[in-house]
Amino acid sequence: MEIQQRKILVTCALPYANGPIHLGHMLEHVQADIWVRFQRLRGHNIHFICADDAHGTPIMLKAQEMGIKPTDMIADIRASHESDFSGFNISFDNYHSTHSEENQALSSQIYIALRENGYITNRTISQLFDPEKKMFLPDRFVKGTCPDCKADDQYGDNCDACGATYSPTEMINPKSAVSGSTPIMKDTEHFFFDLPQFEDMLKVWTKSGALQTEMANKVGEWFETGLKQWDITRDAPYFGFEIPDAPGKFFYVWLDAPIGYMGSFKNLCDKTEGLNFDDYWKKDSAAELYHFIGKDIVNFHSLFWPAVLEGAGFRKPTAVNVHGYVTVNGAKMSKSKGTFIKASTYLDNLDPECLRYYYAAKLTSRIDDLDLNLEDFTQRVNSDVVNKLVNLASRTAGFITKKYDGQLSNHVSEPQLYQSFIDAGTSIAALFEQRDFARAIREIMALADIANKYIDEKAPWALAKQEGSEVKVQEICSMGINLFRVLMTYLKPIIPKLAARSEDFLAETLDWEIIKKPLAGHRINKFKALFQRIDPKHVEAMVDASKDSLEADKAAKQKQAAAQLDAAKSELDKEPLAPEIDFDTFAKTDLRVALITKAEAVPKANKLLKLTLDLGGETRTVFAGIKSAYTPEELEGRLTVMVANLAPRQMKFGLSEGMVLATGPGGKEIHILNPDDGAKPGQRIM
């Protein structure tokens, strides 16, 4: 069946041009790149763009500190960013900068359209002002004592120690992070985007499928608290674009940053014959537009950005695909504190294809955080890519090149087995489309297991010792090569360099449609090592090279732990510990890991969800009072913890066969327990 060609534009969030790319950034760019490469492999017309977010007070001040012009600094940063993305095989069609002629023209055009359509207001506000530097201070350039937990040296918008958010004017003893002086309040006139005018449109759009269910629910909470006008102004001195007809006033970076998607695409159109900007951005465009972003900037992309596009007469995104954060060995990464492994540090020590594969193996369409467990990383890549995939080719290619001059058998000896691998492509393609790369890899590796089992059972190395077995050995090894070819095609979007080396070995381009016909009578090239096993010493070297930044996090972690300890004491005051029990009493409780295979609302029940739990071979039904905190869609496919030996209890709505464990005071603040990566349904919790 011929696939209808789609016109697609894909963007990644724009990295800020004041520091290096780290492995947290790289998750998003790898995720988007895999999806883009898959669409290209399927024959669609797709364009993949990005740019540096190059404006704002932090860039202006850092350039001053370095004694260079902001334009020189952002040019150097852009070069390093492009080098890192290239190193990780991110296949952008265009990488640009928000500090560009295209972006300035589009920002002014959109602002004027919003103003003429009645969506811009102005009013006088009071802000903190540094009297020494004679500049208004953004929240992150005010530091002081947290008004909630009293932790010192916190930023003016949120506390790293306790997580509280607040206004800089609420801080205790605020100081300018620029000069150290005590800021004063000063009036200034600012322009505002009237977001509340778009509430009805946004309520429809956010529920249209443009957002993941979790994000749509989160946006629903913001509607409940009420939308507010957005300040789109910054006062001089500021590095950015001056607002038309407003000398000394500049666009806040969050206005011209998302417009940078359009600016980068406009730059691509201007240098690409036949590529028309309006075909992708005009209001009635039939093209698809996808933004890949992190969950920290959902507010901007789910409310502000679609409203700006609507108000200025442009199309809205088809979907905003949100991912979680990256942790390393369970520890939070923090860009502001410098506690990250830089992309360049990784590239100095390890193959980027390894991280691409590992990220893909853990990426789903949900917004869960992803932990880069370095021990698991080593084991997973070596087991899957080396032992299962590459080994399939290496153990069969030798016979073909040595005994048959590289020529494959003239026919496929196991046509049904080959067809089963081709048929699996339908579900694998659907999983790629849905961005559920983890499940796609599980299906591909299950096929790899079948292929290796086939070779193990046929044992061509033993058969080759028997007289008159030449044809049979050639058929078996040719089958192994053909199955490798199918597997490598499915993995081509994830590990493109390995795919390219495999194409050289197979003397054929890996193509989703072409593999439907097996290779017969085809000559392959001599097998060369396709992939290097991860050496744990190289992982250690990468960690050692990042030690300076990782060590810097220890003091912050200790401070955060102290704040969490204080918070824990507060929780104990609310609900004291239960009376002590002995071990034998505790051991009577059988806690098990359970997979939530199905979750559904219970008619006429305000608090209950009906959960179907898989205990690794046994299925249980449990009614849980967590409806106020979770939708069924958020729960399906997740692991949780249940009391497995609790006596069944007949309820009004059915029989409940256990209990899932959760914490929190109730309402939206209920949190079910999730086992760590590697836990399996049915495992007992000790």
Swiss-Prot record:
What is written in the cofactor note of this entry? Binds 1 zinc ion per subunit.
Motif 'HIGH' region covers 15-25
User: What residues bind ATP, as annotated?
Assistant: K335
Cite the entry's keywords alphabetically.
Aminoacyl-tRNA synthetase, ATP-binding, Cytoplasm, Ligase, Metal-binding, Nucleotide-binding, Protein biosynthesis, RNA-binding, tRNA-binding, Zinc
Which stretches make up the tRNA-binding domain? Answer: 585-686
For the motif 'KMSKS' region, give the residue ranges: 332-336
InterPro entries xref list: aa-tRNA-synth_I_CS, Anticodon_Met, Met-tRNA-synth_bsu_C, Met-tRNA_ligase_1, Met-tRNA_synth, Methionyl/Leucyl_tRNA_Synth, MetRS_core, MetRS_Zn
EC number(s): the record gives 6.1.1.10
GO biological process entries: methionyl-tRNA aminoacylation
Which residues make up the binding site for Zn(2+)?
A: C146, C149, C159, C162
Q: What is its main location?
A: cytoplasm
Q: Which domain of life is it from?
A: Bacteria
Tell me the enzyme class. Answer: ligase
- Give one GO term, molecular function aspect: ATP binding
Per the record, GO CC terms? cytosol
* Reaction catalysis annotation: tRNA(Met) + L-methionine + ATP = L-methionyl-tRNA(Met) + AMP + diphosphate
**Annotated family:** Belongs to the class-I aminoacyl-tRNA synthetase family. MetG type 1 subfamily.
Its quaternary organisation is: Homodimer.
Q: What does this protein do?
A: Is required not only for elongation of protein synthesis but also for the initiation of all mRNA translation through initiator tRNA(fMet) aminoacylation.
User: Which protein are we looking at?
Assistant: Methionine--tRNA ligase
Identify the gene encoding this protein.
metG
